[in-house]
Amino acid sequence: TEEGLFRRADKAGEGFDLDVRVGDEIAPHLIARRLADNWRVLCAAPAYLAAKGTPRTLAELAAHDCLVIKERDHPFGVWQLMGPLGEESVRVTGGLSTNHGEVAHQWCLDGRGILLRSWWDVHDSLQDGRLVQVLEAYHQPADIWAVYTSPLASSAKVRVAVDFFRQYFAERYSLPE
């Protein structure tokens, strides 16, 4: 089923060697190795901003069409962000929501709303101008991790995979200053 595609897998019970995940919520019985520093940023298509205006404060997001993604363990429709005053939250709504990040990214490119998405995922769209970062002083920490169980701690294949992913992210994506 489609629901099965987006559930959290039982790595040990289902025979998975490695899980690559975004976010710092990792069960204590698992081993996690950071693959890359990452954060989620707010962005929108220039066409959306031209039609609806650019939010100037976090509170103004509540009046915008936001593209809400059901993330693993995050409250739906509540964006918790780090900003100039520390951690802040805003409740957001919009006509579109999904549990698939690529769908939300495409909606954002199509000018359907404001998106909170991982830097590595929207980096190219920001670089080529298809998306614009909004409220640049805000971000959500979301590092990228390789997660596995302790029986695989000395596995050569896991070590090679972790090294590959670290190099991949280091060569392609660096966070802005």
Q: What is the predicted function of each stretch?
A:
Residues 32-35, 128-140:
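Short beta-strand->loop
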Residues 1-28:
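Central regulatory/effector-binding core of bacterial HTH transcription factors
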Residues 29-40, 44-69, 84:
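Flexible hinge/capping segments at coil-to-helix
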Residues 13-21, 40, 109-114:
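Alpha-to-beta junction loops
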